[in-house]
């Protein structure tokens, strides 16, 4: 696959629509094996090729939570270059437009850190990607504020921020 975009999704909405998607993911054995987005598109009858929608990726983890008031489906994807938001918009239409889809996508190789948050799930302000000494392997860290990111970077580098902003 191309550069890999890691995206976390939080889906809320009408219980029937959220449960339908969760049941489909379970049928496709999510959390045991990858659920490829093109297979999900085919399951729901979405002609992604005709529509020019990217489904190049997979869901590798999912979790469903429900009580009397809230129905929440969380899942993570890896996709090529960027999130597949057009696919999930189309999936929402197929499920009756009853879903609220929030997501955070990160692909540092393409300078992507984007948040679409309808429910307040992703308060983070920035993402820092680094590799080499003193970071060992490449790392991506998400921070609530840019100031938190600067403080962490200064700590790892062993330097003082001083009066610099």
Regions picked out by a protein language model, each given a short descriptive name:
Residues 1-165:
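Intrinsic low-complexity, intrinsically disordered or marginally ordered coil/linker segments
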């Amino acid at each position: 696959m191309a550069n890999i975009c890691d995206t976390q999704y939080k889906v809320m909405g009408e219980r029937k629509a959220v449960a339908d998607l969760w049941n489909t993911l379970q049928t496709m054995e999510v959390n045991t094996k990858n659920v490829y987005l093109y297979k999900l598109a085919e399951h729901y009858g979405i002609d992604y090729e005709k529509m020019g929608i990217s489904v190049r990726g997979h869901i590798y983890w999912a979790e469903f939570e429900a009580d009397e008031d809230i129905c929440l489906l969380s899942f993570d994807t890896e996709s090529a270059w960027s999130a597949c938001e057009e696919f999930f918009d189309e999936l929402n239409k197929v499920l009756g437009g009853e879903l609220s889809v929030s997501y955070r996508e990160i692909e540092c190789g393409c300078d992507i850190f984007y948040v679409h948050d309808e429910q307040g799930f992703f308060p983070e302000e920035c993402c820092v990607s680094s590799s080499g000494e003193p970071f060992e392997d490449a790392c991506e860290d998400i921070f609530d504020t840019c100031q938190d990111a600067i403080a962490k970077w200064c700590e790892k580098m062993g330097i003082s921020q001083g009066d610099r902003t």
